[in-house]
């Protein structure tokens, strides 16, 4: 039996991913225009989450080579992390969250992020069993990686603006990103 109050919380920030098999663990993040992909293998009892800022990859000169901000890199790392923990690709299922239009501009990076995640998963043959994307406000997300349960809380306008400010800052320095990705 999973007791919600006894949950071990693991917070994910922009540019990170985590893979867990602890049934009492809950992954959490706060999203504005960023997207979180939540994947799991229900048979292996393992799941994970990533949090990316931009769709595509870090191939443009403007990217500064920071692959951890980009969807392609974090999606591959999450899938590979799940496979290393015993998941099988043919059993993976996904839920997608975020992608709000938090700034009034001509470009809608949130919509692009959500579309990228959906297309990536479609191309990989991973079914999306749930999603909540778009809108004008951010959201706080909680995801139980073993059960696949997800819960989100809408953010107020002020909370959304704080989230936007955080998303526009460079990602926190981390250990060097894995530069090789194994494609299956």
Curated annotation (Swiss-Prot):
Keywords: Chemotaxis, Hydrolase. Gene3D superfamilies: 3.30.1330.200. Signal peptide: none annotated. One of its GO terms (biological process) is chemotaxis. One of its GO terms (molecular function) is protein-glutamine glutaminase activity. SUPFAM superfamilies: CNF1/YfiH-like putative cysteine hydrolases (SSF64438). Coiled coil: none annotated. It comes from the Bacteria. It catalyses: L-glutaminyl-[protein] + H2O = L-glutamyl-[protein] + NH4(+). It holds the Pfam family CheD. CDD domains: CheD. InterPro entries: CheD-like_sf, Chemorcpt_Glu_NH3ase_CheD, Cytotoxic_necrot_fac-like_cat. Its EC number is 3.5.1.44. Probably deamidates glutamine residues to glutamate on methyl-accepting chemotaxis receptors (MCPs), playing an important role in chemotaxis. Belongs to the CheD family. HAMAP family: CheD. PANTHER family: CHEMORECEPTOR GLUTAMINE DEAMIDASE CHED-RELATED. This is Probable chemoreceptor glutamine deamidase CheD. It comes from Rhizobium etli (strain ATCC 51251 / DSM 11541 / JCM 21823 / NBRC 15573 / CFN 42). The lineage of its organism: Bacteria, Pseudomonadati, Pseudomonadota, Alphaproteobacteria, Hyphomicrobiales.
